[in-house]
Design a protein with these regions (language model features):
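Outer-membrane pore/translocation modules
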Residues: 102, 108-209, 272, 287
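Short loop/turn motifs that connect adjacent beta-strands in outer-membrane beta-barrel proteins
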Residues: 24-26, 40-48, 93-102, 116, ...
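Cleavable N-terminal export/targeting peptides
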Residues: 1-30, 321-334
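Transmembrane beta-barrel outer-membrane domains
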Residues: 77-83, 121-127, 168-174, 206-212, ...
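N-terminal, post-signal peptide beta-strand-biased segments of exported outer-membrane/organellar beta-barrel
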Residues: 21-90
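Membrane-embedded beta-strand positions of outer-membrane beta-barrel proteins
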Residues: 51-55, 103-107, 132, 146-150, ...
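Outer membrane beta-barrel transmembrane domains
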Residues: 28, 56, 64-72, 206-334
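Hydrophobic, lipid-facing positions within transmembrane beta-strands of outer-membrane proteins
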Residues: 49-51, 55, 82-88, 126-133, ...
Length: 334
């Protein structure tokens, strides 16, 4: 397996949500982009320092009961985002309990907008993602591998607005454990990646977003230098938001969905250039549902909204340094 191919399969690259332009937390305000572990696996590349660059765009429209109760029946309220990400993967060659250790740091920058009648835009630095530990076990020669790790979103992004949610940063921490199970043999990458977001309380608004569960699925085959195959993802909210004493939202959690479920399907194409690997995947969200039973009970109406649309993502990964390589002279050395 080429180094670049191993990196593409192994790097747990996690990017950002496209929902910051809502300027309110709760609901679909996930920190990680749905499907961001598509193409990844439970494998780990050879020791070294790797870099990856990712860009993606999301084009979607708001849907849900709130189309009628909030938007006056407007089904064409668009939500768009463009994101650029740089990240580093560190593989020192250490083992622990039979597992290979690695760590990552990821820094996204993004812009987002919501169309009429909201008409809001933002642009800035998203919260930094630190993954201080990932452990990967290879189960003999079976082709099976298992990886687990913990990601931490630090509240260091661009924060604006009355509640601190008017831009790409968030005034709260997010902890994200992950589990990836893969079959990696004969050119196949059959992987399921499951990860869940646990948010702390917003230090400005005192609002706490509920837990969000992600599941990404990859079924690709390497044919020569090409990799192709179908992909899919799910994400949804699995616990309620909370707006306790001191929360600045007068309506509490009534205006936000307390449950949503979104499914998407698509495909991936990759090419191994040797020193670097390029992959592109695209997905269409085929089902998006949201609800807030408490709002219906209290007001007779449901104001829930989620975005449903299309994502196109391109990723370039390559090794910066390997311990077995001799240092190269500078091109400016005399």
């Amino acid at each position: 397996m080429k180094t670049s191919r191993a990196l593409l399969a192994a790097a747990g690259v996690i990017a950002v949500s496209s929902s910051s332009a809502f300027a309110i937390e709760g609901g679909e305000n996930a920190q990680s982009k749905a499907g961001i572990l598509i193409g990844a696996s439970a494998g780990v590349p050879p020791p070294g320092i790797y870099m990856f660059d990712e860009v993606f765009t999301v084009q979607s429209n708001l849907t849900g009961p709130g189309v009628n109760t909030k938007l006056g029946g407007n089904t064409k309220t668009g939500v768009e985002s463009a994101v650029d990400i740089q990240g580093f993967l560190f593989v020192p060659g250490w083992t622990f309990l039979g597992a290979t250790y690695d760590a990552l740091i990821v820094q996204p920058f993004s812009t987002a907008s919501v169309g009429s009648p909201s008409n809001v835009q933002d642009a800035g630095m998203h919260d930094t993602l630190l993954i201080p530990v990932e452990l990967s076990w290879k189960l003999g020669d079976s082709g099976l591998a298992v990886k687990t790790g913990l990601g931490i979103y630090t509240p260091d992004g661009t924060v604006t607005g009355l509640y601190g949610t008017g831009n790409e940063g968030s005034p709260y921490w997010t902890f994200q454990p992950e589990l990836v199970v893969s079959y990696l043999k004969d050119g196949w990458n059959l992987s399921a990646a499951i990860y869940e977001e646990f948010h702390t309380r917003n230090t400005i608004s005192q609002y706490t977003t509920g837990d969000i569960l992600h599941a990404d699925f990859t079924a690709t085959k390497q044919i020569g230098k090409w990799t192709v195959g179908p992909v899919a993802y799910y994400y949804g909210q699995v616990s309620n938001d909370s707006c306790s004493v001191g929360c600045l939202y007068g309506t509490g959690t009534l205006m936000n969905p307390q449950r949503f479920n979104i499914w998407a399907v698509g495909g991936l194409v990759g090419y191994d250039f040797g020193p670097a690997n390029l992959s592109v995947w695209a997905t269409q969200e085929v089902s998006a549902k949201a609800s807030n039973p408490a709002a219906v009970a209290a007001t007779g109406s449901d104001f829930s909204l989620v975005a449903q649309g299309t994502t196109v993502l391109a990723s370039l990964s390559y090794r910066l340094w390997a311990p077995e390589q001799a240092a190269q002279p500078s091109m400016y050395h005399k």
